[in-house]
Amino acid sequence: MKVILASKSPRRVEILEKIVKEFEVVQSNFDENTIDFKGDIEKYVKDLSRNKAIEVSKRLNEPSIVISADTVVFQDGKVLEKPKNEEDAFSMLSSLSGNTHKVYSGICLINTYDDTVVTDCDCTEVRFSELNPRQIRNYINSGEPMDKAGAYGIQGLGGAFVEGIKGCYYNVMGLPLNKLYKALENYDITIL
């Protein structure tokens, strides 16, 4: 059975390559703005990942396992997705500075052969160092934060701001590896 990653994220590709030998990437065209956050962060990221997987699965012509994910940073009851512009990134990084936040990733696996759908969610706590405005501006000028939830990438320059984490490192990158590995064990595909 084919494995399809419903994401254009190079970080998700890199993570999935750790456990799945062969897969294809098919970008989801689902409009994430059609789902509003209504207070339940786990439901929100699972709904987003499920809708991404459904959109891709409808375009496939052969039995496949479609994997999708959605990752957000959550702090003080607010969802921090990808920054809209540099000012938005500055605001996000300023609010994360010196504080602990949570990163939630929803994952979804759809078996297109029998239409089974599995969703799950992972949460990682991340503690940031105190950052001054110059550090934040320098980081924004690198361009790195502009395509990442919460305006930072733990696997890149943004990792310098992280004092510690509690939970899955790969979840912060965008794909909770252990949860995904456990979910994939139920399918007839080669993993590891």
Curated annotation (Swiss-Prot):
Q: Which cofactor does it need?
A: a divalent metal cation
Active site, renumbered: D70
The record ties this protein, via Pfam families, to:
Maf
| Matches recorded under InterPro entries | ITPase-like_fam, Maf-like
SUPFAM superfamilies assigned: ITPase-like
> What highest taxon heads this organism's lineage?
Bacteria
Alphabetical GO CC annotations of the entry are:
cytoplasm
One GO biological-process annotation of the entry reads: nucleotide metabolic process
Q: Give the catalysed reaction(s), semicolon-separated.
A: dTTP + H2O = dTMP + diphosphate + H(+); UTP + H2O = UMP + diphosphate + H(+)
- EC number(s) for this protein? 3.6.1.9
Query: What Gene3D superfamilies does the record point to?
Result: 3.90.950.10
Alphabetical keyword list: Cytoplasm, Hydrolase, Nucleotide metabolism
- List the molecular function annotations (GO) for this entry: dTTP diphosphatase activity; UTP diphosphatase activity
Intracellular or extracellular location(s): Cytoplasm
Q: In terms of one coarse class, where is the protein primarily found?
A: cytoplasm
Record site feature (Important for substrate specificity), residues = R11, T71, Q155
Q: What family is reported?
A: Belongs to the Maf family. YhdE subfamily.
* Function of the molecule: Nucleoside triphosphate pyrophosphatase that hydrolyzes dTTP and UTP. May have a dual role in cell division arrest and in preventing the incorporation of modified nucleotides into cellular nucleic acids.
HAMAP family reported in the protein's UniProt record: Maf
The protein's name is: dTTP/UTP pyrophosphatase
- Identify the coding gene: maf
